[in-house]
UniProtKB/Swiss-Prot annotation:
It catalyses: uridine(2552) in 23S rRNA + S-adenosyl-L-methionine = 2'-O-methyluridine(2552) in 23S rRNA + S-adenosyl-L-homocysteine + H(+). The keyword tRNA-binding does not apply. The lineage of its organism: Bacteria, Pseudomonadati, Pseudomonadota, Gammaproteobacteria, Vibrionales. This is Ribosomal RNA large subunit methyltransferase E. GO terms for molecular function: rRNA (uridine-2'-O-)-methyltransferase activity. It comes from Photobacterium profundum (strain SS9). HAMAP family: RNA_methyltr_E (MF_01547).
Length: 209
C-alpha cells in the first residue's frame, strides 16, 4: 500500500473513531474504550456477572471489560486480567502482563486464580489483522481455542464464557465444541459492534464438567 493510501485510510479511521457515538459516550462516562458497551449489552441480556464472582478477562487491554466487570462483581469479587500489552492499573483488577501461551505466564495466571475456580471467563482477544482473510482467520481461531482451553482449566461447574469470534473458516466447528461443553449457547452481535466487522460474541452458560 502506498504512503498516500495509508494516510487517507488512517485519516478516515480517525474521523470515524472520533465521530463514533460509543467512543464519545465511553469518554463521557470515564471508560477506557468503546468495547465496554459490548460487554454491557451482553450483561443486560445474559446476566453473566454478579456481585462476589471471580472473573478472568483475557486480552484485557486497555481495560474496558475489566473495568466494567470490576464494577459489577464489587469488593467481594475479583477480576484477574491478562494481556500481552501493558495496561494501567484499575481498582479491583489484578493484571498480569504477558502472553499466556507461554508456560511461565500461564503458571503465574493460574497461581492468581487458584485455589478458587472461576465463575466467568471473558475473552475479547483478537490478533493484529493484516487484511488477508486467509491468514487472519486461522490466527483469530487459534486465540479463541486458547480461551476455551482456559475454561477447561479454571471454570467452575455452571460457569459462563463470553468470547469474541470472527465468522469464517473454523467458526461452525468451534461453536459445536462450545455447545458440547455448555448447557446454553447464544450468539450476540452487540449494537456497538461495527456492521462491517465479522465479529460476533458467543455467550455460553452452564459449564458442564
Amino acid at each position: 500500500m502506498s504512503r498516500n493510501k495509508q494516510s487517507a485510510s488512517s485519516g478516515r479511521w480517525l474521523k470515524e473513531h472520533f465521530d463514533d457515538k460509543y467512543v464519545q459516550e465511553a469518554q463521557k462516562r470515564g471508560y477506557r474504550s468503546r468495547a465496554i458497551f459490548k460487554i454491557e449489552e451482553i450483561q443486560k441480556k445474559d446476566k453473566l456477572l454478579k456481585p462476589g464472582m471471580t472473573v478472568v478477562d483475557l486480552g484485557a487491554a486497555p481495560g474496558g471489560w475489566s473495568q466494567y466487570a470490576a464494577e459489577v462483581v464489587g469488593d467481594e469479587g475479583q477480576v484477574i486480567a491478562c494481556d500481552i500489552l501493558s495496561m494501567d492499573s484499575l481498582p479491583g483488577v489484578s493484571f498480569l502482563q504477558g502472553d499466556f501461551r507461554e508456560e511461565a505466564v500461564l503458571s503465574a495466571l493460574l497461581e492468581r486464580i487458584q485455589p478458587d475456580m472461576v465463575d466467568v471467563v471473558l475473552s475479547d482477544m483478537a490478533p493484529n489483522m493484516s487484511g488477508n482473510l486467509a491468514s487472519d482467520q486461522p490466527r483469530a481461531m487459534y486465540l479463541v481455542e486458547l480461551a476455551l482451553e482456559m475454561c477447561k482449566q479454571v471454570l467452575a461447574p455452571n460457569g459462563s464464557f463470553a468470547v469474541k469470534v470472527f465468522q469464517g473458516e473454523g467458526f461452525d466447528q468451534y461453536l459445536a465444541e462450545i455447545r458440547n461443553m455448555f448447557k446454553v449457547v447464544k450468539i450476540r452481535k452487540p449494537d456497538s459492534s461495527r456492521d462491517r466487522s465479522r465479529e460476533v460474541y458467543i455467550v455460553a452458560t452452564g459449564y458442564k464438567l
